[in-house]
Swiss-Prot record:
Family membership: Belongs to the krueppel C2H2-type zinc-finger protein family.
Organism, as annotated: Mus musculus (Mouse)
Function noted in UniProt: Transcription factor that mediates a transcriptional program in various innate and adaptive immune tissue-resident lymphocyte T-cell types such as tissue-resident memory T (Trm), natural killer (trNK) and natural killer T (NKT) cells and negatively regulates gene expression of proteins that promote the egress of tissue-resident T-cell populations from non-lymphoid organs.
Mutant phenotype after disruption: Mice show a reduction in tissue-resident memory T (Trm) cell population maintenance in the skin, gut, liver and kidney but not of splenic T-cells. Double knockouts for Znf683 and Prdm1/Blimp1 result in a stronger inhibition of Trm cell population maintenance. Display an enhancement of natural killer T (NKT) cells migration preferentially to the white pulp of the spleen in response to chemotactic stimuli. Also results in the derepressed expression of a large number of genes implicated in the egress of tissue-resident T-cells from non-lymphoide organs.
Matches recorded under InterPro entries: Zinc_finger, Znf_C2H2_sf, Znf_C2H2_type
Triggers of expression: Up-regulated by interleukin IL15 in a TBX21/T-bet-dependent manner in tissue-resident memory T (Trm) cell population. Up-regulated during the differentiation of natural killer T (NKT) cells. Down-regulated in NKT cells after antigenic stimulation.
SUPFAM superfamilies cross-referenced by the UniProt entry: beta-beta-alpha zinc fingers
PANTHER family from the UniProt entry: PR DOMAIN ZINC FINGER PROTEIN, ZINC FINGER PROTEIN 683
Protein name stated in the entry: Tissue-resident T-cell transcription regulator protein ZNF683
Region (Disordered): 84-109, 249-275
Zinc fingers (C2H2-type) by residue: 301-323, 329-351, 357-379
Amino acid sequence: MKALDGLRESLYPSLDFQLYQDDQVCSADASQPLADSVGAHDLAWSERMCPLPLAPAKSPLLACPESPDLCLCALQKTPLGRAPQDLGEDASNMRHQPPSLYKASTDSEKLTIKDSLNREEMGNEPERGAYPHLPPRTSSFPDAGLDRKSLSPLTFWPWLPPTLISKEPPIHIYPIFPGYPLLPLPYLFTYGALPSAQHPYLFMLPPHSTYPTVAGPSLLMTASGSGPRIPQEKTLLLHSGAFQSAGHTLHSQVESRSSRDTRTPGQAGVAAPTRRAVPGSRAGVIALPYPLKKENGKILYECNVCGKNFGQLSNLKVHLRVHSGERPFQCALCQKRFTQLAHLQKHHLVHTGERPHQCQVCHKRFSSSSNLKTHLRLHSGAKPSQCGLCPSYLTPNVYPKLHHRLRAPQLRGLTHTHLPLASLTCLAQWHQGALDLVEKKMGWTVDKVSSESKGKQG
């Protein structure tokens, strides 16, 4: 028997219970004798109860041990004339009911009453014009009768990752309007502001929101690929008064940022400078120091110094370098300058020693094709050109040009020299003596050239 009593004491220890009656809570030990709660004839048991501080809720609930089970009985104020049997039926309905269900029902009733009061208070406020009305959301929230403490946060917000969330429900952000508070009227909770460090997903939008958003895409970020959220560095104010003042600034920031994004590079100011065209000028003609003439609807590319005509504008520009003395192309080895790039490339062959052009008759090589053409005239026996000032016939191609230049300058050159007739006569005589000296030293005579060509052919 002692072993059975010890086992019973270990399985069913002394049951301490609390009695919630009106504004006081009382505790008692199960070992003390208690009167029957149904009969309620002997009230001497209430004198042995120890009054405790006020309970958080007014619930006439009494816990009474009956055999090894714990039964809950409700103490209700009954009107006069009601039979005790009716009280027994009410008490039997409350027997064997788990404490958690009763607690859940009371909590749900409190939340329901609280929500209804909040909605009545918010409904009395006047509606604000010039902004769309926000209907209450009933699809994404569960029924008020369910136990909100027993449900996990993933039930309300399935897109959130499993993070530590406090007991206060998170606050959602709905469409941002300058004159509206942060939350819509039906869901403006009275909970205090929570620090954003403990709740990284505090400012979240529901995944299936039916309200249009005003904030631009640059202010919203995606968290783990689901549900847009506002970045943490853009902290929002939770109280409605401060947000009403900050709503206009947020809207203006969004508009200014979108306007900056839609600007073209030409409208960016200093970052993309625009080119201003000179009035009355065309592209490509700005480099010329003088206007071009037109004849029969065509532009004449004529040099204003020597009057030479060209078929293209680029050729005229290259020709103008001869008169201006400009030589933009310089050799990196000998620092020699040239007016054209082709002349510089040809000059590089002198430093490299390359001779790409070869004569097919004597297999002599040349650095340029023009020199090869001049050399081929020796093998062909072509008659040389005759000088207009003297009866000499010259075979090489370079020598007739030099001969003509030294013999007598052109009339156009004579007009620029402004020399008298006597000076011109002396110059012609000097040219004649110089030509004779060159011919003697170089051996450029007609007879010698003809004999050399005949000997090679024979």
